[in-house]
Amino acid sequence: MTRSATIVGSGPNGLAAALALARDGIHVTVLEAESEIGGGTRSHRPFTTVDLLVDHCAGFHPMAVGSPALAGLEQHGLTWRWPEIDCAHPLLDDAAALLHRSVNETAVGLGADGKRWKALFGQPSSSYDRLSADLLGPVVHLPRHPLLLARFGAPTALPAAVLSRAFATPQARALFVGAAAHAMRPLTEVFSSAIGVGILTAGHHNGWPVAEGGTAAISRAMHSALIELGATVQTSTRVASRADLPSSDITIFDTTPSVVADVLGQELTTRTRRSYNRFRHGPAAFKVDLAVRGGVPWTDPRVAQAGTVHVGGSAEDTVAAEAAVAAGRMPDRPFVLVGQQFVADPQRADGDVVPLYAYAHVPAGLDHDVTDVVIDRIEQFAPGLRSRIVETVTTSPQSFAGGNANFVGGDILCGTSSPTQLLLGPRPGRDPYRTGTPGFYLCSAATPPGPGAHGMAGLNAARRALDDLLKR
């Protein structure tokens, strides 16, 4: 008898879970509330005066390239493209910090901090193929490579603001803190180094590539593989109650924990239901997409070759901005993550007009327009930018939430990475994917290894579901 599975949500984790189950012979149905699959991996052409391809949310993929959840998708059209420089962090009145895939090349550019940078990232990045087996699963588990994991894990427990002080140069301090700021949390908290150490280690092994043809190429490839395996994908199909769920042997939610609590209700234990409803969401993103004629006039021209640009100023400026956001205040000089995907994937541009992707970290639910604040912040490091802007499109926290139910209040990470949630996940217990109710699982970015287009939470949840199915 053919077993069946229902996946609620078609973000990268939902699609990865669906793929893993379908490859095991399970008949899979994916239900997506929006009219388009992909969740945070969608891409679109939002401008009216020029034809530019823009990523909606996820844009750079140091954790996705090489992910077991995405294995084999090259056969379905997924192609990675790498920029000449992975990431740049411009500084006022000083040379920019440059991140290269090569640890050695990065270290050379960091001068006096080169040896320290290599000491922190050299060995873990060279061993990333083995290390990732532990990093891409639950935080609490029996490690496959305990010594490697211990060496990697020790610095991750430190506050990013503290670990950055191990470096002497403003470039190294800013480069590290900028990476840590991807966590969208106070950088003075314990474990706030974890995301920074993780993506820098992965990046030194994998680079920070983009998907050719937009991040949506990831979800398109996954969809193609699913259809080939006989799966069904239904869009514009919202699951709001238990009655909306078909009867299946396995049901996996690529949703917020609170949605699982709403849909399953009394089928969950009181403890799980309470934990899911208490799950905390973090700060928001305010996104500004710019059509720029002639490229961005960065003060340091090398920044123009970088796929990712961290506009945060000094390490101290970034720490202050993230602290303000966490406290509910809009900083005058926010941390802005800028994407120049077109340097690796030229088809995204339209002649000499290029798409500049930029999102600022802002307080959750911010309800006013900060477009000028974001542009002003970028222009501090690229004087004359405004005169080159052809068209502007903004995505507010409310717009993010309206187009993706997982982005509560504009939180594009699907939950705060506070120490408690980082270690315990959405509910107490050894397994963050099992809901405690047989046959039902959670696989969104609210579960380890967290945000990104890597799909590993989906693969991990599917593996749990298959293990449990064999025991029934």
How would you describe each model-predicted region?
Residues S258-D262, A291, D350-R377:
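Conserved FAD/dinucleotide-binding core of flavoprotein oxidoreductases
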Residues T237-A349:
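Mid-domain catalytic core of redox enzymes
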Residues R116, G295-V296, R329-P331, L366-A405:
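Flavin-binding catalytic cores
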Residues I199-V239:
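Helical element adjacent to the flavin cofactor pocket in flavoenzyme catalytic cores
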Residues L92-F191:
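Rossmann-like flavin
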Residues R3-D129:
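N-terminal glycine-rich phosphate/pyrophosphate-binding loop and immediately adjacent elements
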Residues T169-P186, R333-L337, G384-P448:
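A glycine-rich dinucleotide-binding beta-alpha-beta segment and adjacent secondary-structure elements
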Residues C443-L466:
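A conserved FAD-binding loop/helix module that cradles the flavin
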